[in-house]
Protein backbone atom coordinates (compact mmCIF):
# COMPACT_ATOMS: atom_id res chain seq x y z
CA UNK A 1 0.00 0.00 0.00
CA UNK A 2 2.85 2.38 0.82
CA UNK A 3 4.41 1.72 -2.60
CA UNK A 4 1.17 2.58 -4.39
CA UNK A 5 0.79 5.74 -2.34
CA UNK A 6 4.40 6.70 -3.07
CA UNK A 7 3.90 6.19 -6.79
CA UNK A 8 0.72 8.28 -6.77
CA UNK A 9 2.49 11.09 -4.91
CA UNK A 10 5.27 11.08 -7.51
CA UNK A 11 2.65 11.32 -10.27
CA UNK A 12 0.84 14.18 -8.55
CA UNK A 13 4.07 16.10 -8.01
CA UNK A 14 5.21 15.54 -11.58
CA UNK A 15 1.89 16.76 -12.97
CA UNK A 16 1.90 19.85 -10.79
CA UNK A 17 5.31 20.81 -12.17
CA UNK A 18 3.61 21.38 -15.55
CA UNK A 19 6.42 19.78 -17.47
CA UNK A 20 5.27 18.33 -20.73
CA UNK A 21 7.09 15.52 -22.45
CA UNK A 22 6.48 15.18 -26.14
CA UNK A 23 8.10 12.52 -28.29
CA UNK A 24 7.63 12.80 -32.01
CA UNK A 25 8.67 9.94 -34.28
CA UNK A 26 9.23 11.34 -37.75
CA UNK A 27 10.45 8.28 -39.61
CA UNK A 28 10.69 4.53 -39.27
CA UNK A 29 13.12 2.07 -40.76
CA UNK A 30 14.75 2.69 -44.15
CA UNK A 31 13.01 -0.24 -45.84
CA UNK A 32 9.65 -0.86 -44.18
CA UNK A 33 8.08 -4.27 -44.69
CA UNK A 34 5.42 -4.17 -47.42
CA UNK A 35 2.09 -5.58 -46.27
CA UNK A 36 -1.35 -5.65 -47.86
CA UNK A 37 -4.24 -5.45 -45.40
CA UNK A 38 -7.40 -6.03 -47.42
CA UNK A 39 -10.54 -4.35 -46.01
CA UNK A 40 -12.45 -7.05 -44.13
CA UNK A 41 -15.76 -8.06 -45.70
CA UNK A 42 -18.88 -7.47 -43.59
CA UNK A 43 -21.92 -9.68 -44.17
CA UNK A 44 -24.26 -7.85 -41.80
CA UNK A 45 -26.63 -4.95 -42.21
CA UNK A 46 -25.51 -1.35 -41.89
CA UNK A 47 -22.03 0.04 -41.37
CA UNK A 48 -19.75 -1.05 -38.53
CA UNK A 49 -18.54 1.60 -36.08
CA UNK A 50 -14.91 0.46 -36.44
CA UNK A 51 -12.93 -0.69 -39.47
CA UNK A 52 -10.75 -3.58 -38.27
CA UNK A 53 -8.41 -3.38 -41.28
CA UNK A 54 -7.85 0.35 -40.64
CA UNK A 55 -6.99 -0.39 -37.00
CA UNK A 56 -4.41 -2.99 -38.09
CA UNK A 57 -2.91 -0.67 -40.72
CA UNK A 58 -2.72 2.18 -38.20
CA UNK A 59 -1.02 -0.02 -35.62
CA UNK A 60 1.56 -1.47 -38.00
CA UNK A 61 2.40 1.81 -39.74
CA UNK A 62 2.62 3.69 -36.45
CA UNK A 63 5.64 1.63 -35.35
CA UNK A 64 7.40 2.59 -38.58
CA UNK A 65 8.43 -0.94 -39.55
CA UNK A 66 5.62 -1.59 -42.04
CA UNK A 67 4.29 0.09 -45.18
CA UNK A 68 0.70 -0.84 -46.00
CA UNK A 69 -0.60 -0.97 -49.55
CA UNK A 70 -3.50 1.39 -50.22
CA UNK A 71 -6.75 -0.50 -51.01
CA UNK A 72 -7.06 1.60 -54.17
CA UNK A 73 -3.88 -0.04 -55.49
CA UNK A 74 -5.00 -3.62 -54.81
CA UNK A 75 -5.71 -5.86 -57.80
CA UNK A 76 -8.31 -7.90 -55.90
CA UNK A 77 -10.12 -7.90 -52.56
CA UNK A 78 -9.96 -11.45 -51.21
CA UNK A 79 -11.60 -12.18 -47.88
CA UNK A 80 -10.47 -15.79 -47.44
CA UNK A 81 -7.64 -18.13 -48.47
CA UNK A 82 -9.48 -19.62 -51.46
CA UNK A 83 -9.65 -16.15 -53.07
CA UNK A 84 -5.93 -15.33 -52.70
CA UNK A 85 -3.81 -15.27 -55.86
CA UNK A 86 -0.22 -14.91 -54.71
CA UNK A 87 1.02 -13.64 -58.09
CA UNK A 88 -1.20 -10.54 -57.73
CA UNK A 89 0.49 -9.66 -54.45
CA UNK A 90 4.00 -10.43 -55.69
CA UNK A 91 3.32 -8.17 -58.70
CA UNK A 92 2.53 -5.43 -56.18
CA UNK A 93 5.77 -6.23 -54.26
CA UNK A 94 3.95 -7.23 -51.08
CA UNK A 95 5.68 -9.58 -48.64
CA UNK A 96 2.64 -10.26 -46.47
CA UNK A 97 -1.14 -10.33 -46.88
CA UNK A 98 -3.93 -10.10 -44.31
CA UNK A 99 -7.54 -10.87 -45.24
CA UNK A 100 -10.68 -11.34 -43.20
CA UNK A 101 -14.43 -11.39 -42.80
CA UNK A 102 -16.78 -10.11 -40.14
CA UNK A 103 -20.11 -11.87 -39.52
CA UNK A 104 -22.82 -11.83 -36.89
CA UNK A 105 -22.35 -14.69 -34.45
CA UNK A 106 -25.31 -17.06 -34.82
CA UNK A 107 -28.11 -16.28 -32.38
CA UNK A 108 -26.45 -13.33 -30.67
CA UNK A 109 -25.53 -9.66 -30.94
CA UNK A 110 -21.84 -10.56 -31.09
CA UNK A 111 -19.66 -10.50 -34.20
CA UNK A 112 -17.09 -13.02 -35.37
CA UNK A 113 -13.92 -11.71 -36.99
CA UNK A 114 -12.15 -14.37 -39.02
CA UNK A 115 -8.71 -13.44 -40.33
CA UNK A 116 -5.96 -15.18 -42.27
CA UNK A 117 -2.36 -13.99 -42.55
CA UNK A 118 -0.07 -15.09 -45.40
CA UNK A 119 3.59 -14.97 -46.40
CA UNK A 120 3.23 -14.02 -50.08
CA UNK A 121 6.69 -15.11 -51.25
CA UNK A 122 6.51 -18.55 -49.64
CA UNK A 123 2.77 -18.90 -50.48
CA UNK A 124 2.19 -19.95 -46.90
CA UNK A 125 -0.61 -19.26 -44.43
CA UNK A 126 1.08 -18.13 -41.21
CA UNK A 127 -1.97 -17.62 -38.99
CA UNK A 128 -5.71 -17.71 -38.94
CA UNK A 129 -8.24 -17.39 -36.18
CA UNK A 130 -11.83 -16.50 -35.38
CA UNK A 131 -12.21 -13.84 -32.67
CA UNK A 132 -15.63 -13.14 -31.16
CA UNK A 133 -16.75 -9.96 -29.42
CA UNK A 134 -19.24 -7.14 -29.43
CA UNK A 135 -19.25 -4.43 -32.09
CA UNK A 136 -17.81 -2.12 -29.42
CA UNK A 137 -14.80 -4.47 -29.13
CA UNK A 138 -13.85 -4.36 -32.83
CA UNK A 139 -11.00 -1.94 -32.13
CA UNK A 140 -9.59 -4.29 -29.48
CA UNK A 141 -9.91 -7.20 -31.91
CA UNK A 142 -7.98 -5.18 -34.50
CA UNK A 143 -5.22 -4.57 -31.95
CA UNK A 144 -5.10 -8.30 -31.18
CA UNK A 145 -4.70 -9.13 -34.88
CA UNK A 146 -1.93 -6.50 -35.11
CA UNK A 147 -0.13 -8.21 -32.22
CA UNK A 148 -0.22 -11.57 -34.02
CA UNK A 149 1.02 -10.09 -37.31
CA UNK A 150 3.77 -8.07 -35.64
CA UNK A 151 5.09 -11.03 -33.66
CA UNK A 152 5.04 -13.42 -36.63
CA UNK A 153 6.96 -10.98 -38.84
CA UNK A 154 9.41 -9.45 -36.35
CA UNK A 155 9.71 -12.14 -33.69
CA UNK A 156 8.91 -9.52 -31.05
CA UNK A 157 5.68 -9.58 -29.09
CA UNK A 158 3.26 -6.83 -30.17
CA UNK A 159 2.03 -4.25 -27.67
CA UNK A 160 -0.97 -2.86 -29.50
CA UNK A 161 -3.44 -3.80 -26.72
CA UNK A 162 -1.46 -1.73 -24.23
CA UNK A 163 -3.42 0.73 -22.15
CA UNK A 164 -1.94 3.56 -20.12
CA UNK A 165 -3.17 4.94 -16.81
CA UNK A 166 -2.44 8.57 -16.02
CA UNK A 167 -3.55 11.27 -13.59
CA UNK A 168 -5.27 14.43 -14.78
CA UNK A 169 -5.16 17.46 -12.48
CA UNK A 170 -8.18 19.77 -12.52
CA UNK A 171 -8.72 23.14 -10.86
CA UNK A 172 -5.00 23.67 -10.37
CA UNK A 173 -4.09 26.75 -8.43
CA UNK A 174 -7.43 26.85 -6.64
CA UNK A 175 -8.32 25.85 -3.14
CA UNK A 176 -9.81 22.57 -4.39
CA UNK A 177 -7.48 20.54 -6.59
CA UNK A 178 -9.15 17.53 -8.15
CA UNK A 179 -7.33 14.59 -9.62
CA UNK A 180 -8.82 12.08 -11.99
CA UNK A 181 -7.36 8.74 -13.07
CA UNK A 182 -7.74 8.23 -16.84
CA UNK A 183 -7.20 5.19 -19.02
CA UNK A 184 -6.12 5.48 -22.66
CA UNK A 185 -5.28 3.20 -25.56
CA UNK A 186 -1.61 3.30 -26.54
CA UNK A 187 -2.53 5.12 -29.74
Q: Model-predicted segments: where are they?
A:
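Positively charged n-region of N-terminal signal peptides that target proteins for export
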Residues: 1-4
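Bacterial N-terminal signal peptides
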Residues: 6-14
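Sec/Tat signal peptide C-region and signal peptidase I cleavage site
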Residues: 15-19
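Amphipathic beta-strand/beta-sheet edge segments enriched in Tyr/Trp
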Residues: 21-22, 81-148
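Short beta-strand->alpha-helix linker/helix-N-cap micro-motif
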Residues: 24-87, 98, 104
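Residue position within the beta-strands of beta-propeller blades
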Residues: 99, 164-169
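Structural motif
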Residues: 107-113, 172-182
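Short loop/turn segments that connect beta-strands within beta-propeller blades
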Residues: 120-121, 185-187
Amino acid sequence: MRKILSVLIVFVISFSARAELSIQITQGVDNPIPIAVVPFSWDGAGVLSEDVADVVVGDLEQVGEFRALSPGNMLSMPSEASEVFYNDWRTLAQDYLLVGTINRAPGSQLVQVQYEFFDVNRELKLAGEVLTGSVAQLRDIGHEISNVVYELVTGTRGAFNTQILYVVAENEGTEYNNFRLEKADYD
